[in-house]
Amino acid sequence: MKIAVYGKGGIGKSTTSCNISIALARRGKKVLQIGCDPKHDSTFTLTGFLIPTIIDTLQSKDYHYEDVWPEDVIYKGYGRCDCVEAGGPPAGAGCGGYVVGETVKLLKELNAFYEYDIILFDVLGDVVCGGFAAPLNYADYCIIITDNGFDALFAANRIAASVREKARTHPLRLAGLVGNRTSKRDLIDKYVEACPMPVLEVLPLIEDIRVSRVKGKTLFEMVELQPSLKYVCDFYLNIADQILSKPEGIIPKEVPDRELFSLLSDFYLNPVNTVNEKNKPNLIDFMII
């Protein structure tokens, strides 16, 4: 199974991806996480350092694939998760989609691409071009990371549009949304009402999730010294269990941009209407009585 994780830049995709990878490994699966970001820091919390990228390795070998060995590009991370960083072209030049393609090509050459139960692509920021939508060409499922904010949900909607487009020619489905570090989910619920899709999990506003990134550790590793964090790991295990159940998934129908802008902004600008809508059923019940 291959999974592509997308979401607004800075929303916590890499932190979430690493913890999901560990959760899948804890369920007995052989997992490979592929970072698809020029920053090459996707797997930092799994390995504890910035591993060399596929592109760096290929350049050092003058792109002679036959001179590259699995141990040159695949690094062992915490919890028996294997890690690869695709890297990216120089700033302002080249195409990120090409880099993803070269990464998959090399892993196939090394007979490594099909050795794993789960391959998880952690993809940078929003989908702004066909190049960075390239991981969707290989994925069975897409997971979108968001929070309860306007910008993150707007980005989620654009990603949903990319999933729908790719699903025309690939066996791709949207597994659902994951809310990351949010104290509320009212805006998420409002969006899902307009663009129906599963919500796999909503993680509460836990500071240790952010701190784990700085420490270069997953929550599963931190819990070894802080048992009180075990309940946080259960959120990721729940996501892993849903993925392993091979959900049917959906082909989303995104909300038009202007309509979504109006929907989400109205939620903040006219909170009274929202409150009244929530109270309507109670009023009706009272009238019936």
Swiss-Prot record:
Binding site for ATP: G10, I11, G12, K13, S14, T15, K39, N180, R181
Gene3D superfamilies for this protein: P-loop containing nucleotide triphosphate hydrolases
Example GO BP: photosynthesis, dark reaction
Entry-linked CDD domains: Bchl-like
Positions annotated to bind [4Fe-4S] cluster: C95, C129
Keyword Iron appears in the UniProt entry: yes
Sorted UniProt keywords: 4Fe-4S, ATP-binding, Chlorophyll biosynthesis, Chloroplast, Iron, Iron-sulfur, Magnesium, Metal-binding, Nucleotide-binding, Oxidoreductase, Photosynthesis, Plastid
Single annotated GO MF: oxidoreductase activity, acting on the CH-CH group of donors, iron-sulfur protein as acceptor
Annotated residues for binding of Mg(2+): S14
EC number(s) on file: 1.3.7.7
Assembly notes: Homodimer. Protochlorophyllide reductase is composed of three subunits; ChlL, ChlN and ChlB.
UniProt-listed NCBIfam families: DPOR_bchL
Protein name: Light-independent protochlorophyllide reductase iron-sulfur ATP-binding protein
Organism annotation: Marchantia polymorpha
UniProt lineage: Eukaryota, Viridiplantae, Streptophyta, Embryophyta, Marchantiophyta
